Amino acid sequence: MLKAADLTGALAEHYVPILKIILVTAFLTQKLHDRYGPVVRISPNHLSFTQPDAWKEIYGFQPSSKGSTEMNKSKIFSETVEELPKSIINADREEHQRLRRALAHGFSDASMREQEGMIIKYIDKLSDRLKEFADDGTSPQNMAGWYNWTTFDVAGDLIFGQSFQCLERADYHPWVAFIFGAIRFGSVMTSVKYIGLNFVVQALFKMGGMKAMSQVRENTDEMMQNRMRMTDDRNDLFEGLLKRRKEWNLSFDQLSANALILVLAGSETTATTLSGTTYLLLTHPEVYEKLKKEVRSAFKDSSEINIGSVSKLSYMLAVLNESLRLYPPVTSGIIREAPEGGCRIGGQHIPEGTLVEIQQWSSNHSPDNWPDPWKFDPERFLESEKTNVNRLDSLQAFSVGPRNCIGRK
C-alpha cells in the first residue's frame, strides 16, 4: 500500500499551501517530479502523478465493491462556497450525465457546422481590427487581449445569443473584466480552504465575495433572460439545455450557472492556447515557415478554410498538440479523492481519502514522457507509432473519462 506519508517531497507540505495562494503550485510540483520521480507528495494527504496510465486510473472509471465508478472530485476544490448554485462542474454523477446529454448536441459536428458561419464572422472581424490597429505591422499588439476579446465574443453569441462586443470596443466588456477578477479571487479562496480555513472562506464571501458574485450573477441572469426570450431555434451550445428545462425541472439559477461555466470554458482556455501557439511560432521561425507552406498549399483563398478542411492539415494539428503540451491552458490538475476501500494507481494501492491528481504542467514536461521536454518540436506527433519514443498518451489537454471536456472537438 502506498501512503502519502511514505513518499518524498516533504518540503512541499510546508510551502504548497502558501504557493497555491500565489498561483505557482504547478511549477513547484514539476520541479518535485524532476527530483523525486513520477509520484510525489505535495501536501500531507495529497499525491501528484505523471505516469500516462494514471490518467484513466484517476479520471476514468474504477472497479469497486459497488461496480464501476468514478472518483469523486474533492469538495475542497469543487465546492468552495456553499451558497453558489450547482453546475456541470460540481454536479454529482447522475446530474452530470443528465446535463452532459443535454449539451452534447450543441457540440456535435452537425451543430458546429451550422454555427461555422457565425464563428468565421468573428475571425474575420479579428483580422480586420488587427489590420486597423497594427499600422501595417509597425505597431505592437497584445495578442493575448485580442484572442480573449474574440473568444469571449464567440462564446457569448454561442451561449447567450449575443456578443460581448469586445472586438468592437477593442477592450473587455465590463462583465468579462470582472469575471477575471472573480476567478483570481476564487483561486485564493480555494487555497485558503485547502489549508483548513473554511470559516475564513465563508467570512470573506459574506464580507465582499457575495457582493462581487451578486454583480456577476446579475449580469449573467440578464443575458440568460434575453436568451430565453429568443423564439427562433438557434441550435447553439445552450439550446439542448433550454429545451429540457421544464422536463428536468431545471431552475433559472442552474441554467445561469451552467451558462457562465460554458462561457468561461469556451473562451479563456482557447485564447490561452492561441496565445501560446502564436508565441511559440514566432520564436521558432522554421516551424512557422513549414506551417505557412502547408496552409498556403492547401487552400487557394480563405473561403476554402472551414472546420472540415483544417482537420486535414496534419502539421497544423501537430503544432497545436505541441503547443498544448508546452503551454497548457490549465497547468494544474483536477483533484480527486480515492474512494472507499482505496484504489490502484500506477500499480500501487492508494488508501481511501487520499487526494490524487495529474498536473498537466508536470506531465507535459516530464522527461519520462517526452525526450527533451522543453523543446518545441511538432514532429513528435508525426512520427510513426513503432518508432515514436514520446508517450503521446500522456498529453490529455481535455482530460479523460466521463468528465472530460465536452468541447474537445
Give, region by region, the residue ranges found by the protein language model.
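Hydrophobic, repeat-rich solenoid/adaptor surfaces of innate immune receptors and signaling proteins
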Residues: 51, 126, 273-278, 360
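Cytochrome P450 catalytic-core helices
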Residues: 269-294, 408-409
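Conserved cytochrome P450 K-helix/beta-meander segment immediately N-terminal to the heme-binding cysteine loop
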Residues: 239, 358-386
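Cytochrome P450 heme-iron axial ligand motif
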Residues: 262-269, 279, 387-409
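Conserved cytochrome P450 K-helix E-x-x-R motif and the immediately C-terminal K′/meander segment
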Residues: 17, 21-29, 218, 304-346
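Structural signal for hydrophobic/aromatic residues that build the beta-strand cores
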Residues: 32, 42, 123, 155, ...
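N-terminal membrane-proximal hinge/A-helix region immediately C-terminal to the signal-anchor transmembrane segment
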Residues: 1-98, 120-125, 129, 150, ...
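Cytochrome P450 heme-thiolate monooxygenase catalytic core
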Residues: 66-81, 114-274, 290
